[in-house]
Regions:
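Transmembrane alpha-helical segments of polytopic membrane transport and secretion proteins
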Residues: 1-31, 273-292
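Hydrophobic alpha-helical transmembrane segments of membrane transport/permease proteins
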Residues: 2, 31, 35, 39-74, ...
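Membrane-water interface segments at the C-terminal ends of transmembrane alpha-helices
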Residues: 31-50, 85, 124-147, 157, ...
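Generic hydrophobic transmembrane alpha-helix motif, especially the helices
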Residues: 68, 72, 78, 102-104, ...
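Transmembrane alpha-helix signature in integral membrane proteins
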Residues: 78-113
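Glycine-rich helix-loop "coupling/hinge" segments at transmembrane-helix boundaries
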Residues: 141-145, 171-172, 213, 221-264, ...
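C-terminal transmembrane helix and the adjacent membrane-cytosol boundary/short C-terminal tail
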Residues: 159, 205-215, 254-292
Length: 292
């Protein structure tokens, strides 16, 4: 009976994702995110220009039919660099958060399940890390590792590790006393089977929502590091680096900084709106489960 309870939760585990897309704000925000990802992936097919080819005679061209978003100080098409910059910003932020989620969930699950000294150690380190702003942690790590995509990804992953470890630990502490866990244990299931087959899948939904919201913060963090020259290095475009080069040309060619800034702002807003839709869908799911 208890095992049946565990299995019944499985098929509906990610049903709240579909529920989020049924909400108007979730559908609009989710649609924007999907279009942005498609634009980044198929950038070579959407623009005839190369992101790294300079043409000084075309420098500082305002938005026109030939260059929809204008050109930068080196004559490079801004729309092209914006699309390729989306590749950098989205991939760095999403992969970093994915690494952070995987590591944080593993540590948090082990700490919450086994308890004892390991739990106290993980909690102490997580609390210490949690007390510092993510940007400070990222700046310190990038200074140690060095600038570039790899350093930025490592810095962002470590900066958000404590968030997912704490959240997962709390979920595991709440779930490990459930009847289906006791039933699985009484049937002779090992610790690894219980953690990875029963506990982590049922703790995934709130972690997924938190990861979605953290991805928006990670995009801002990646753009900040790029603005200071600590992110992706030239000629690889990134939204932060584009804003950095455009900041000195605000009055001469404002479009160079405006469009990357709008890209960051609209993307983060869309991610947050979709995250809010996920939270609302998750609340409804939990309320229905409590009423059963």
């Amino acid at each position: 009976m208890s095992m049946t309870l565990s299995e019944n939760r499985g098929p509906n585990r990610l049903a709240f994702l579909r529920a989020a897309f049924r909400r108007p704000a979730g559908a609009i925000a989710g649609g924007y995110i999907v279009l942005l990802i498609l634009g980044a992936v198929f950038a070579p097919l959407l623009t005839p220009y190369a992101y790294d080819v300079q043409s000084l005679k075309d420098a500082f061209q305002p938005p026109s039919a030939a260059h929809l978003l204008g050109t930068d100080e080196f004559g490079r098409d801004l729309l092209t660099r914006l699309l390729y910059g989306a590749r950098t910003s989205l991939s760095v932020s999403s992969i970093s958060i994915l690494i952070s989620v995987m590591a944080g969930m593993t540590l948090g699950a082990a700490a919450g399940y086994f308890g004892g000294f390991f739990d106290r150690a993980v909690t102490a380190v997580a609390d210490l890390t949690w007390s510092f702003p993510e940007i400070l942690i990222a700046l310190i790590l990038v200074a140690i590792i060095g600038p570039g995509v790899s350093g930025t990804m490592a810095a962002i992953a470590v900066a958000y590790l404590a968030q997912f470890a704490r959240l997962t630990r709390a979920q595991i502490m709440m779930l490990k006393g459930e009847t289906f866990i006791e039933a699985s244990r009484s049937l002779g299931s090992g610790h690894a089977h219980i953690i990875f087959r029963h506990l982590l899948p049922n703790a995934l939904a709130p972690v997924l929502v938190s990861a979605m919201l953290a991805t928006g913060d990670a995009i801002i963090l990646e753009a900040t590091l790029g603005f200071f020259g600590l992110g992706a290095q030239p000629p690889t475009p990134s939204w932060g680096a584009m804003m950095s080069s455009g900041s000195a040309l605000l009055f001469k060619a404002p479009w160079i900084i405006i469009f990357p800034g709008l890209a960051v702002a609209t993307t983060v807003i869309a991610i947050n709106l979709f995250g809010d839709a996920l939270i609302a869908a998750l609340d409804i799911r939990d309320r229905l489960r409590r009423d059963e």
